[in-house]
Amino acid sequence: MERILKPVFLAILIVLSFSSQCMGFGESCQAGKHIVPVGQQQIDSSTCTLYKCSNYNRKYALETTSCATLKMKSGCRMVPGAATAPFPNCCPMMMCKG
């Protein structure tokens, strides 16, 4: 029985070790006060910014997405997004007549 358990236990450890490396287990990206685990995303509602931490061949990248800069046109006005809304609904919009 012990002969069977040792290889099985070793195989389980190898699989768990490999899966944690592939998933970036325990790894994270930092954006100011935000710590984003690999494979997850967080929203900074104070700046309406989306942070996503990705694993590209064991190289971690912090992807940052924020609201576009709007160039005002005549006959249009800026409407702020809802401060508590998730990204991108928190971004301001341009409302134009006609």
Swiss-Prot record:
Species assigned in the record:
Urodacus yaschenkoi (Inland robust scorpion)
Q: Where in the cell is it found?
A: Secreted
Where, by tissue, is this protein expressed?
Answer: Expressed by the venom gland.
Gene Ontology cellular component terms for the protein in this record:
extracellular region
Listed name of the protein: La1-like protein 13
The entry's comment on post-translational modification says: Contains 4 disulfide bonds.
InterPro entries linked to this entry: SVWC_dom (IPR029277)
Q: Would I find Signal among this entry's keywords?
A: yes
Pfam families under this entry? Answer: SVWC (PF15430)
User: Lysine amide modification sites?
Assistant: K97
Similarity comment: family membership: Belongs to the scorpion La1-like peptide family.
Signal sequence segment: 1-24
Going by the UniProt record, its keywords in alphabetical order are: Amidation, Disulfide bond, Secreted, Signal
